Structures are given as C-alpha cells and as structure tokens.
Amino acid sequence: WIQQHTPDDISGGYSESLSDMIVDSRETLLRVLHYPHLTGHEPTGALRAAAHEDINLITILPSSNQSGLQVKGSDGRWIDVPEGDDKLVVNIGDMLQEVSGGYYPSTTHRVINPTFAANKPRMSLPLFLHPRPDVRLSERYTAASYLEERLRELGVK
C-alpha cells in the first residue's frame, strides 16, 4: 500500500520495491510488550515509554487492549491512538524515512498512563519489518550499516 501511494519521483529512487526489501529478512521481529496494570498511585498521563522513533522500515501493530499510545502530529501535538479490536496501527520507521529521502518522516510515538481503566494491563504486539541487511537504503547506507550506526548512537552496541 505504501509503495502504491508513493509518488514516482520518490519510489523511483528506491533500490528495490519495499515489499522486496523485506523478503528473506532475518531482522524482522515480533515483540510482545506487557505494561503491568497500575496501582492507582501513578499520575495520569505520566510516561510509560518515552517518545521515540522505530529504527526499522515499518512497524505494524494491532491496536492495544488499553489506551495510552500517542503519536506526535506534524504540529507537535500528541494525538491519542484509538484502541479497539478492529484497528491496525502502521508506523513509519527511520529506515523508510532514509530510503524515501525524508518524504515519509518517522513516526514519533510514546505510551502514557491511561486516563481510565488503569487497573488493566496493557499489551502490545508490534511487528517490526526490517529490510535485509544488504538492501541499499541510500547512497550513504545499507540497512546493515544504518542499523549498526543507530544501535551505536543508542549505546546498545
């Protein structure tokens, strides 16, 4: 869907189609994130996961069973992502921002304490779609070199 709705002058710069970039990738991963229920002493709106962007191409996640996920709009305001069984959230990652030359900016997002039903735990199942390490993201980076640099910046490597 993203590839189909990308202007030709942008997608023409891709080294290969987005769907081909993830074929046979061993970097793609599914995570199970559990946020325990709140005790009632935590302030509403306090951070559970600080604002960040994902390193990968695209993150796909079914909407959580609990509110709290927010995305940062282009105006700098935080927008609540609705929860519900029939919703799917798609976040643009840093690698797609790189491969698109900034046409698709990374989705800045965070998780805050819910305003209601805080006695329920929050579950999230993000699927982080990564390209194969050999995929050329830009003149400057392959997927492997980009990931390595970002992990060093984060102090993970």
Which residues does each predicted region cover?
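C-terminal flanking tails of non-heme Fe-dependent oxygenases
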Residues: 1-157
